[in-house]
């Protein structure tokens, strides 16, 4: 019907200027990457992994800041990838300000990141968590080299969740 078609066109035009940002936070091994991949498969939205730009194994706090400062900014959004082999900045990854985004990684749900996402359009924040031992096992199974860094990273996660993280819209805790 013509009326339904007109409503669809109006909504599509409106959406073209208001992208959706989904911020998915949680500690290592909680299921953020799996969840973001499942959501992207259903929506075709671009996924940005904080793992791509944390500046090294001591860079959780800086990586968290980069979400608002670079990834979600309304002019020239993107980020400098981190070259984990060279332990130095890599190439620039450009983003389209109009794209719906799924931003996943520990450090993604902060007051600054939520505010930056709201500047772009609609934002939904998610926290995923589970038992530490199971998370550790999952994280190391995915990336065996991570075992030597798990406790270093976990200390940064604890500090982040105690001091910087914002309350998420949705909390998914598995056991």
Language model: regions and residue ranges:
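Short, small-residue-biased leader/transition segments that mark boundaries at the very start
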Residues: 1-8
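Hydrophobic anchor at the beta1->P-loop junction of P-loop NTPases
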Residues: 24
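Hydrophobic positions on the alpha1 helix immediately C-terminal to the Walker A/P-loop
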Residues: 35
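Conserved nucleotide-sensing/catalytic segment adjacent to the nucleotide-binding pocket
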Residues: 54-103
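Small-molecule kinase domains that catalyze NTP-dependent phosphoryl transfer to phosphate-bearing small molecules
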Residues: 143-175
């Amino acid at each position: 019907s013509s009326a339904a078609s007109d409503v669809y066109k109006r909504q599509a035009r409106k959406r073209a200027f208001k992208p959706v940002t989904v911020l998915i936070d949680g500690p290592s091994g909680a299921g953020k990457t799996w969840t973001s991949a499942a959501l992207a498969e259903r929506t075709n939205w671009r996924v940005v992994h904080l793992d791509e730009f944390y500046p090294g194994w001591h860079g959780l706090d800086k990586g968290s800041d980069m979400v608002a400062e670079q990834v979600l900014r309304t002019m020239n959004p993107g980020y400098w990838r981190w070259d984990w082999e060279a332990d130095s900045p890599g190439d620039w990854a450009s983003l389209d300000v109009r794209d719906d985004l799924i931003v996943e990684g520990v450090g993604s749900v902060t007051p600054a990141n939520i505010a930056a996402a709201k500047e772009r359009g609609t934002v939904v924040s998610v926290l995923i968590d589970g038992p530490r031992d199971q998370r550790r096992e999952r994280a190391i199974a995915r990336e065996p080299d991570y075992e030597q860094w798990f406790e270093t990273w976990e200390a940064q996660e604890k500090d982040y969740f105690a001091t910087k993280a914002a309350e998420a819209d949705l909390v998914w805790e598995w056991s």
